[in-house]
């Protein structure tokens, strides 16, 4: 005979957790908004504004992820309860096993939805930009910056984000001096926002004929893509716009026309670059979008600076903050904020970052 009470208790627990999430995630409001979005998308006129239609499509996906999951949890627990009753009545082990399996699937869906509570920031659902910049250390630091770029590109692709390399400036000998990546997808900024900071590499340098240990640094800065409706005070006279030939790793030119665009916001010395489009006009439009997003994030950080300094338990998230060390000779990668470690260094550098990111989100960084 099988143990029924543990399964009954699990069903009860899942129902209670689902009910808590229903309130926390504003299920009723999201359900109502989903109906409104569906109605808008059914109106053929919406496709006259492609950007608006795409934004509605993304909103629909985000709303469905909550509404449909909660609906599945509610009906799913009812179904499991029915299976359990059948199993007990018929004394059927196979039906009992099926009930347990379905319950495990429901619990996985519930845990994934519970994790969404970490994305409570006002811009967590936005697309995101990641700026990488090599620190001091010459070729070794530039190679490290390129390794980080590869790591984040692989992570983004594995998470199902659309990943765009907006700009990369080749290193003097190897690697890159810097790069900007755009991540498009649900909660891109929410996933990435705790990656802002300094990443430290310790290894025997392949560029040192003596095989000595070198320490290198690279900075990551993450900021959300902002809606066009958000007003950012940007005086055209404060902008310096330069055009240049796009170049790849190692300094080689990737095209022969001056289509790449660099925009500097002089008052804040904020610089953005774009070279992934063939057209100078498109690169300029993308660079302006990046600049708006970056200035928005800097403004948010400035507004929160006083609060951050008062919260002793939390790290300063400025450019000077070292968040993670990668000591390859000792096969150890450690997050200095959460204490999370991994000995599988190659796996992490191949993009398996969720262990670190989830820990930082759960700790409220």
Curated annotation (Swiss-Prot):
One of its GO terms (molecular function) is translation release factor activity, codon specific. The modification N5-methylglutamine is found at residue 252. The keyword Cytoplasm applies. It comes from the Bacteria. Methylated by PrmC. Methylation increases the termination efficiency of RF2. Its main location: cytoplasm. Belongs to the prokaryotic/mitochondrial release factor family. NCBIfam families: prfB. This is Peptide chain release factor 2. It comes from Pseudoalteromonas translucida (strain TAC 125).
């Amino acid at each position: 005979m099988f143990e029924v009470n543990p399964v009954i208790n699990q069903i009860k627990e899942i129902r209670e957790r689902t009910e808590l999430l229903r309130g926390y995630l504003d299920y009723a409001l999201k359900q109502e908004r989903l109906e409104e979005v569906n109605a808008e998308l059914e109106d053929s006129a919406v496709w006259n504004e492609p950007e608006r239609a795409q934004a509605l499509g993304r909103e629909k996906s985000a709303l469905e992820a909550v509404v449909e999951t909660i609906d599945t949890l509610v009906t799913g627990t009812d179904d499991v309860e029915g299976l359990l009753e059948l199993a007990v009545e018929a004394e059927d082990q196979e039906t009992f096993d099926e009930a347990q399996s379905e319950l495990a699937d429901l619990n996985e869906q519930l845990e994934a939805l519970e994790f969404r509570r970490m994305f409570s920031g006002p811009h967590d659902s936005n697309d995101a930009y990641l700026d990488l910049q090599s620190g001091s250390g010459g070729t070794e630091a530039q190679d490290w910056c390129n390794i980080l770029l590869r790591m984040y590109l692989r992570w983004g692709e594995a998470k199902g984000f659309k990943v765009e390399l907006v700009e990369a400036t080749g290193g003097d000998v190897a690697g890159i001096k810097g790069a900007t990546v755009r991540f498009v997808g649900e909660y891109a900024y929410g996933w990435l926002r705790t990656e802002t900071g300094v990443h430290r590499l310790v290894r025997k340098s392949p560029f040192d004929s003596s095989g000595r240990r070198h320490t290198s640094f690279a900075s990551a800065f993450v900021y959300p893509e902002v809606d066009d409706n958000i007003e950012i005070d940007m005086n055209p006279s404060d902008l310096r716009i330069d055009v240049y030939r796009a170049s790849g790793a190692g300094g080689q030119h990737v095209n022969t026309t001056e289509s790449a665009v660099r925009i500097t916001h002089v008052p804040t010395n904020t610089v953005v670059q774009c070279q992934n489009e063939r057209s100078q006009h498109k690169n300029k439009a993308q660079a302006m979008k990046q600049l708006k997003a970056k200035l928005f994030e800097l403004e948010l950080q400035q507004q929160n600076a006083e609060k951050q300094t008062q919260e002793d338990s939390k790290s300063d998230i400025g450019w000077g903050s070292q968040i993670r060390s990668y000591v390859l000779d000792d096969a150890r990668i450690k997050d200095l904020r959460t204490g999370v470690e991994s000995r599988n260094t190659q796996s992490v550098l191949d993009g398996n970052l969720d262990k670190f990111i989830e820990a930082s989100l759960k700790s409220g960084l």
